[in-house]
Amino acid sequence: MESKTINDVVVSESNHELASSSPSEFEKNQKHYQEIIATLPHKDGWRPKDPFVEYGGHWWLQPLLEGLLHAQKFFKARPNDFFVCSYPKTGTTWLKALTFAIANRSKFDVSTNPLLKRNPHEFVPYIEIDFPFFPSVDVLKDEGNTLFSTHIPYDLLPESVVKSGCKIVYIWRDPKDTFVSMWTFAHKERSQQGPVVSIEEAFDKYCQGLSAYGPYLDHVLGYWKAYQANPDQILFLKYETMRADPLPYVKRLAEFMGYGFTKEEEEGNVVEKVVKLCSFETLKNLEANKGEKDREDRPAVYANSAYFRKGKVGDWQNYLTPEMVARIDGLMEEKFKGTGFLSSKS
């Protein structure tokens, strides 16, 4: 296999440049990333030993920022790649399962789909996490894999993702449910960085944009504007709308991906079978996603079960005060005023 050297880093010319590089090569670059990060503004995070770092107008946890810097420099997207983009806790796991099931339904029927045995995150790798930190996982070594994911804001995506013409699906969720899901999810992390702050303190930080991957509303708005400018390249979905009536959106997603369902498949209830396979209820109750079971391909700071809490719409009502609700609703109204977003059905 032919290789070339870029800035003293050996880069494979196979799948996505660094897909076959060893972790030690990332570590050589990691020191440089850490030197950059040391010069950037820091603020207290949701844990006492886990501060946020400002970069590119967004706030980051240091490991994620190291991964971003690496992906920006080395990840090379191809025109036929497909990206699941989202902010944390907005429906990512569900959307990963759907894209994998849609793209691979000619290889597996519902009874043999690998999703029944392993967590969806193993099949759709993060370019800012798996790509830099775990480049030897099977999915990154598979030259035929075209499914990738990221929580990176649109304006900081690797240049090749935007310019290659590869397609993107973005999912967003009510910011109140997103916050509650993030805060409860943080408690499930196997962390040595100290306890998670109270829900009141975390909410205040969240409203200031101090959460992983920066201000949530800016994240949504960035992808919304990109979708408005490039509707053929970006599909924009709303979690609550999909949960209420998944069938038409799964068909729309499949068509957008280039894997549209045939008339015969629709008559054979294949769409319904895909929806059921990837449903919250099905995935949550699989042995692979119960208890403290971990993903099989690499170490993880979360058990597989952490990704399946309730999957419900409106759970924020059990956590937020009227004052909190008014604050986040006001921020949303202000952020999206004049953008056409609030009147959209997406």
Swiss-Prot record:
GO molecular function, one term: aromatic desulfoglucosinolate sulfotransferase activity
Disulfide bonds: none
Catalytic activity: an aliphatic (Z)-desulfo-glucosinolate + 3'-phosphoadenylyl sulfate = a (Z)-omega-(methylsulfanyl)-N-sulfo-alkylhydroximate S-glucoside + adenosine 3',5'-bisphosphate + H(+)
Induction of expression: Induced by coronatine, but not by methyl jasmonate or high sulfate concentration.
Subcellular location(s) per record: Cytoplasm
Active site as annotated: H151 (proton acceptor)
UniProt keyword terms in alphabetical order: Cytoplasm, Transferase
Activity regulation description: Inhibited by phosphoadenosine 5'-phosphate (PAP).
Main location: cytoplasm
GO-annotated cellular components: cytoplasm; nucleus
Pfam families the record matches: Sulfotransfer_1
Annotated binding of 3'-phosphoadenylyl sulfate, by residue: K89, T90, G91, T92, T93, W94, R173, S181, Y239, R309, K310, G311
Tissue-wise expression: Highly expressed in roots, stems and mature leaves. Low expression in young leaves and flowers. Barely detected in siliques.
pH dependence: Optimum pH is 9.0.
UniProt key word Cell division: no
PANTHER family: SULFOTRANSFERASE SULT (PTHR11783)
Family the UniProt entry places it in: Belongs to the sulfotransferase 1 family.
Function per UniProt: Sulfotransferase that utilizes 3'-phospho-5'-adenylyl sulfate (PAPS) as sulfonate donor to catalyze the sulfate conjugation of desulfo-glucosinolates (dsGSs), the final step in the biosynthesis of the glucosinolate core structure. Substrate preference is desulfo-benzyl glucosinolate > desulfo-6-methylthiohexyl glucosinolate. Increased specific activity with increasing chain length of desulfo-glucosinolate derived from methionine. Preferred substrate is desulfo-8-methylthiooctyl glucosinolate.
UniProt protein name: Cytosolic sulfotransferase 17
